[in-house]
Amino acid sequence: MAVVTMRQLLESGVHFGHQTRRWNPKMKRFIFTERNGIYIIDLQQSLTDIDRAFSFVKDTVAHGGSILFVGTKKQAQEAVAEQASRVGMPYVNQRWLGGMLTNFQTVSKRLSRLKELEEIDFDDVAASGRTKKELLMMRREKDKLERTLGGIREMAKVPSAVWIVDTKKEHLAVAEARKLNIPVVAILDTNCDPDEVDYPIPGNDDAIRAVGLLTRVIADAVAEGTVARHGGSAPGEAGTAEEPLAEWERELLQGDTDEQSSAANTEEPTPAEAEALEAPADTPAEPLAAEADGETVAEAPAEVETAAEAPAEAEAEVEAESATPAEAEVEAESATPAEAEAETPAESTDEQA
């Protein structure tokens, strides 16, 4: 599957070239036709060249290389900075300093100076040990270095390849790259020289949407190459590659997946545990000790109620036993204490006889 479709190229205006009077005859093979005094670029060849450049960039990054994004014209500054930052690659979107590649040793010294200035706290005058004027001059130096070298702050060596927007404007970058035999991948408009570029992509280098689309394609190739270099799988759909993850992010995501799987295994009871829960327990287990204590406490009020009901039942039984015929009650009530004492000795005498 192509990394970009013909419809996307047409919507972005990649097929528009320069005026017919501003052209390079070497670009004739990439021109489809002329309309209203403007050349129309053959997008079929552009698609083929995009796939070729995409594969080259992906393989270069997969083998540990780096890509330098270069685009100092206003139409390309934002797209170059955004896409290069997304994939963690160096970029130059302001002024190209002469010798940035051929004299990289000197440039690396300026990068070290920039990092030193970034560590200074310009707001704390007393702690810095410098005067306000010195701090002001150093702040201006820092701002200037950030503007020109901020995009290549982390570039420790010469890049493996260079992505360039508008080779005519960036002729210094093209010359330095060719001198160092660094492959050049670039957008070629109808006024450019294709012999200076190793992997040309015929297209419009003046439209913001066209530059943004092609730069995003190269950034996607860098992203896929980074994923392949770290042993990951490439994204399913070409042209929509996601930003490569760092190693600590991969470990964090892997740890979250393991925790979720272990939690799922803990929540689901095993068949043996399910049978144990369904079967009645003959003897109380240790985990049920708390429940047993709760049941004992709950039964205590019931025992108190039973004890309170016992006297009432005893009184009822006494009343039932005392329920004798009316005559017996009358005799019992009419008997005096004297008669009761007289009857007692008589009964004892008869027993002795």
Curated annotation (Swiss-Prot):
Region (Disordered), start-end ranges: 256-353
Gene3D superfamilies: Glucose-6-phosphate isomerase like protein, domain 1, Helix hairpin bin
GO cellular component: cytosolic small ribosomal subunit
Keywords: Ribonucleoprotein, Ribosomal protein
Any one biological process term the GO annotation gives: translation
Similarity annotation: Belongs to the universal ribosomal protein uS2 family.
Stated name of the protein: Small ribosomal subunit protein uS2
Taxonomic lineage of the native organism: Bacteria, Bacillati, Actinomycetota, Actinomycetes, Micrococcales
